[in-house]
Amino acid sequence: MRHFLFTFLLVISFGANAQTVSKNLYQELKYRSIGPFRASRTVGAVGIPSQPNVFFMGVNNGGVWKSEDYGRTWNPIFDDQPTGSVGDIAVSPSNPNIIYVGSGEGLHRPDLSVGDGVFKSVDGGKTWSHVGLNDVQQIGRLIVHPTNPDIVFVAGLGHPYGPNEMRGVFRTTDGGKSWEKVFYINRNTGAIQIEFDPTNPQILYVDMWEHQEGPWENAAFSGDHSGLFKSTDGGNTWKQLTNGLPGAAQGLGRIGFGISNSNPKRLYATVDAKQNGGIYRSDDAGESWSLIQTDRRLWGRGGDFAEIRVHPKNPDIVFTGNVAAYKSSDGGKTWWSFKGAPGGDDYHRLWINPEHPDIMFFAVDQGATITVNGGKTWSSWLNQPTSQMYHVATDNQFPYWVYGGQQESGAIGTASRGNGGQISFRDWIGIGSDEYAAVAPDPKNPDLIYGGRIMRFNKKTGQSQNVAPEALRSGKYRMLRTLPLLFHPADPNMLLFGTNVLWKTMNGGEKWEIISPDLTRKQPEVPASVGDFKTEEMETMRQRAVIYAVSASPLDVNTIWAGTDDGLVHITND
């Protein structure tokens, strides 16, 4: 069973053990958003150059939001659409009322939500229509022709967990009524970034990336067919740019690139490769490249981060996004940290207003943040209820508290009713566990919260303590980033925790015992659905085959169900 990712925490949590009840008992209840109001991963970021106060952000599982006051407030404009997973947003330069949205997270991860194609608005985001490419599933980037809003190019990543034909570069010339695949390599190689030459829309660049997310936590971030390509005839034909860049022999993976508006022959690239990775520069429109910086802080983890942008009016000023953001003012020779307040990490996307370059928009793991003065001050991201939540739990106190693991921010909790009625970002607290945590409040003591793998948090003292089984340190037992943790509903003293075996403690983690054998397959091989693209990483990754779901009977303390991530379901009655 895959993770369920929630855009909002819901006040009412329906547990797996809930009995069927009459709708008459709850039909008058209404959902309300209670946060959290610190956002999670955001990768779509764009503004309108001629309307410098207007911005659009695309959230991995939160849809599309619009701000008309430089990020002070955000309003959802995509809630009535069938997907909340967004990879990119593009506004037509010639008619800013025309907006295209590419769905799917546009990332490479073991836990993501796929999309169902491209959406279009012709009224500034008030209404939307679906315009195709359903089975691309992951759209990394889309761009709109500078003078013709009906011409759009899409960089399609394709299926994240297996091969498919819907990968590569797609083009429409009629506003999305029909699409043509204009560049395709194979069933495992997708496109993740595409850009126009700023002065000639007949010239395009695209990064083709051969990669695949395997089952469990194992993945391949490079393949023989990855590379940077260029078209000079509007996308009809393409050639690979290789002079000076790493290739298949060097384990080339993802390439992120930026083009100078003021000097289109100047390109920068952040190149992820097992050998010779780094920041590269071209001064002849990509025909040749030079390695100018090897500092891994700038390009490391290139499968996750590959953002590099050039100042619109100065080709020597360049920004790159990685775990942190960095800036260079000497053509990429030297760099220093350039962060958006209030901090945060994992900088996925940067949009710079081409007419007012002091206006910049970062999309990061904590949401959207905007500066209007070149980075001196930034807007808050504590106004964006777009978080990705792993699991939801409630306790027994009054008013009851709601807990969960928030992507990129750790495990958190809040009372279901604020002191002033409305719940704000100030009401949420960290509870000392990780972002993927299943959270288990103690049924007998609401001040004790268990979470993750496994921390015990005391709300009164604010202290956290690791109470995981000591035997886990031996390396004998398998764990993934999110694992089941729950109190047995028929025995408030019994805390259950799943690895590849099921653990039980009756005293808050002071002593643990194993109550099951290994419930997973002996040989969890890579499934045939992965296709021919099997790499050493996929075959040798150790963290696979765990108990992924546990449910206990509220009527019988001896009855427990367990499901594994390699497709098995078990039950015990003793």
Model-assigned labels for residue ranges:
Residues 19-574:
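Beta-propeller blade termini and top-face loops
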Residues 1-4, 308:
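Positively charged n-region of N-terminal signal peptides that target proteins for export
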Residues 6-8:
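Sec-dependent N-terminal signal peptides
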Residues 13-15:
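N-terminal signal peptide c-region/cleavage motif recognized by signal peptidases
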